[in-house]
């Protein structure tokens, strides 16, 4: 560590702490306000528990960043916390889209109906053959034809990232204790480059699965304006990860000071600013106002909001529909939190177990196939040896004795 690098860090630390702390405070206050609004009007638990989980990403990021920025000793545990919650937030966003589509059963029905459209155009028999033979390529190029398989792949992609991200976070902590992690060091004898490669691939695959799922279902999600939600969330996950990776490269090649505290501090400072921007965006992207009203059939309260919609018919006629929504009474924040923790936790555990079983299944089949192949080769070799011995005995017995 050079004297110049140490001096640079000391000169910038206090101003960055003040500026970063200000942005982090704004981010936390705005996010908590938005979260409390959803908890106060918790009228659609299926959707709102995942919205709250996504919104909570901002205060988690902002809090751990300002703590890490104030004291570099807490950098690693804060980074582990951020990585774990990032993976969970990505899973929560995917679950939110599924909830907006009416739940898993309706999503599967919709995807199955979508997959039948190409069959009608191309011919059922030919398309079914292509679907069976090229499922992977269909997922990459034409996910519409996969039907139920698309939902399975999407869920597997999100959950595998959550599992790998959490596992690598604790592996990082273990390697750091052993002194072989080498944060920001791209050297083969450190664990850092290997973990970066694994997480990069895992994250890219998870995001790609989410993009493909969005491409197929975005027409059904128009009511919630999915593009703005998708961009705002993806920007946090994608930008912060590659931002940290880019800073590590710049420090490694000497473009920025190589001091570890400077590298981590710069990342934390930028995240504090970015979380304030994200918190403002979330107020408009994930508003609580749509949940302030519920269908009139679900509540006996009189205060209501009425909206009229004009529907044009093909023949030129006009139909006016009236929708009445009742203003929802406030819900208990304690009960809302309990539902998020208990019901959401059960949902996560179920999907994690299902994903692990899906991953173990092909491995078990592969191991069984290898064992069967080895066993068959051993039997074949034993059979050949027995045949050779029999031939030798036959030859010896068939030779006439010498006179």
From Swiss-Prot:
Locations listed in the record: Membrane
Cysteines joined through disulfide linkages: none
SMART domains assigned: Solute_trans_a (SM01417)
Top-level taxon in the UniProt lineage: Eukaryota
Region annotation (Disordered) ranges: 381-403
Pfam families: Solute_trans_a (PF03619)
Membrane topology, record value: Multi-pass membrane protein
Residues that span the membrane, as ranges: 16-36, 50-70, 162-182, 191-211, 236-256, 269-289
Gene Ontology cellular component list: membrane
InterPro entries in UniProt: Ostalpha/TMEM184C
Keyword terms, alphabetized: Membrane, Transmembrane, Transmembrane helix
Alphabetized PANTHER family for the sequence: ORGANIC SOLUTE TRANSPORTER-RELATED
Annotated family: Belongs to the TMEM184 family.
Name of the protein in its database record: Protein LAZ1 homolog 2
């Amino acid at each position: 560590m050079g004297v110049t690098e140490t001096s640079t860090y000391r000169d910038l630390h206090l101003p960055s702490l003040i500026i970063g702390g200000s942005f982090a405070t704004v981010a936390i206050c705005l996010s908590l306000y938005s979260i409390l609004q959803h908890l106060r009007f918790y009228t659609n638990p299926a959707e709102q528990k995942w919205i709250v989980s996504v919104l909570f990403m901002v205060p988690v990021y902002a809090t751990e960043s300002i703590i890490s920025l104030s004291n570099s000793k807490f950098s690693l545990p804060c980074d582990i916390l951020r990585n774990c919650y990032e993976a969970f937030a990505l899973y929560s966003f995917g679950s939110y889209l599924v909830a907006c589509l009416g739940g898993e059963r309706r999503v599967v029905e919709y995807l199955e109906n979508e997959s039948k459209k190409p069959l009608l155009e191309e011919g059922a028999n030919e398309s079914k053959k292509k679907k069976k033979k090229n499922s992977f390529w269909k997922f990459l190029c034409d996910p519409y034809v996969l039907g139920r398989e698309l939902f399975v792949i999407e869920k597997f992609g999100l959950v595998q990232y959550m599992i790998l991200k959490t596992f690598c976070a604790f592996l990082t902590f273990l390697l750091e204790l052993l002194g072989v992690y080498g944060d920001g060091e791209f050297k083969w004898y450190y664990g850092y480059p290997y973990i970066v490669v694994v997480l990069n691939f895992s994250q890219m695959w998870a995001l790609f699965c989410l993009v493909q799922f969005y491409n197929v279902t975005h027409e059904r999600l128009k009511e919630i304006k999915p593009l703005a939600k998708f961009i705002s969330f993806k920007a946090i996950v994608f930008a912060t990860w590659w931002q940290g990776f880019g800073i590590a490269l710049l420090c490694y090649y000497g473009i920025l000071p190589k001091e570890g505290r400077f590298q981590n501090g710069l990342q934390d400072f930028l995240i504090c600013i970015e979380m304030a921007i994200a918190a403002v965006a979330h107020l408009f992207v994930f508003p609580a106002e749509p949940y302030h009203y519920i269908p009139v059939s679900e509540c006996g309260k009189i205060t209501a909001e009425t909206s009229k919609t004009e529907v044009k018919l093909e023949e030129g006629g006009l139909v006016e529909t009236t929708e009445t929504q009742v203003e929802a009474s406030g819900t208990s924040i304690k009960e809302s939190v309990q539902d998020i923790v208990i019901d959401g936790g059960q949902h996560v555990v179920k999907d994690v177990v299902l994903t692990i079983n899906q991953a173990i299944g092909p491995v078990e089949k592969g191991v069984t196939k290898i064992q069967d192949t080895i066993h068959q080769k051993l039997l074949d070799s034993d059979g050949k040896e027995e045949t050779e011995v029999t031939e030798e005995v036959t030859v010896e017995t068939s030779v006439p004795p010498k006179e």
